[in-house]
Amino acid sequence: MQLILKHTQMCHYRTAGYTGAASEQFEILLFAYSLNDEPTRIIDLASGEKISDKIMEYLTDDSVIKTAYNAAFERNCINRFFGLSLKPEGWRCTLVQASMLSLPLSLEGVGETLNLDKKKMSEGKDLIRYFCMPCKPTKANGGRTRNLPSDAPEKWELFKTYCIRDVDVEKQIRNKLTKFPIPDREQELYCMDQRINDRGIMVDQELIGHAVACDLLYKETVTKK
């Protein structure tokens, strides 16, 4: 069984991965998925919709293979938002697969290179800035610091379409690359890499503190010159 995933998050979007998910502002707004190549569905979490118990069961079942472009990002954000501890063994990353074939690293770039029928929507960047990043309070927007679905219903519907399209693109990429599977040994290394990132590493905090101080001192000296 295959589950293709894509989510859209709210946080300071200049951060990503572990740092972004650790933000107090972090939340998942939209959750799009396709089960066994069925039509893509979307769950509007920001508007109060809920993920079904069955899908949550699939997420936590390592025998159900979850696929995503940059699966580490999806897995980490899902873990953070739902309080889960999803293991990398249940995931496959089409970004890793594409990289092994020297394809571009972006979803958009892979779509263009493979000449997919459906490609990533160019409107996505503006929609992400609008809904996923804090906004400047003004008189025109009523002093709000965040744009909600109710503030721009038409944009929100387009945002949902964008999220669905990303899953459709990811499905096409997965299907195009089925003849070039990630070797078992490489998948083992990927899982090891993910476990290390999940756990983190021990560092000498005193050394790090001095390194930061040296960097600041150097920048101050160069600036004065």
Named regions from a protein language model:
Residues 1-27:
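Entry/capping segment at the start of metal-dependent catalytic domains
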Residues 6, 71-72, 208:
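An acidic- and aromatic-residue-enriched active-site/binding cleft used to recognize and process polar
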Residues 15, 30, 129-133, 198, ...:
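Generic structural "secondary-structure junction" signal
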Residues 26-33, 37-178, 185-190:
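Active-site-proximal helix-loop-helix substrate-binding element of RNase H-like nuclease domains
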Residues 184-225:
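Extended, well-ordered alpha-helical scaffold/bundle regions in very large, multi-domain proteins
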